[in-house]
Amino acid sequence: MIALVLASDPGQVGITRCLVRAALEYRGLGHYVPEAEIIASELVTNAIQHARSTDPSDKIGLTLMRGWDREAISVVVTDSSPLPPVRHETTTASEQGRGLQIVEALSAHWGWNHEQGGKAVYAILAK
């Protein structure tokens, strides 16, 4: 469906939301936009914060794919860190650490895989 390469920079999070919205609406999949925007921005934010290396040329990949059954889409974010994503337990006073909880709440399923040169974190949205 769509594949993008983003700089490992916090300014890319807002761009991510705009691109996800535009891509899904263009393809008539606007009903996925609210959840897909949030999931993509959370996964890109995690990649920027936790996979940041000393190499400013490091890139983050974002892919949106429609499922073979055409009833679901996948949001996939790749980064250069081989470390697994960690879902933190938070309290109402916590100011950070809710990203993967949000992804879990908004998706039908999420997970991650090792990729050459890093990992891919994905979330599947079904309507």
Predicted segments with their positions:
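Conserved ATP-binding N-box helix of the HATPase_c
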Residues: 31-55
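Bergerat-fold GHKL ATPase/HATPase_c domain
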Residues: 1-38
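Conserved beta-strand-loop-beta-strand hairpin that lines the nucleotide-binding pocket
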Residues: 1-3, 48-127
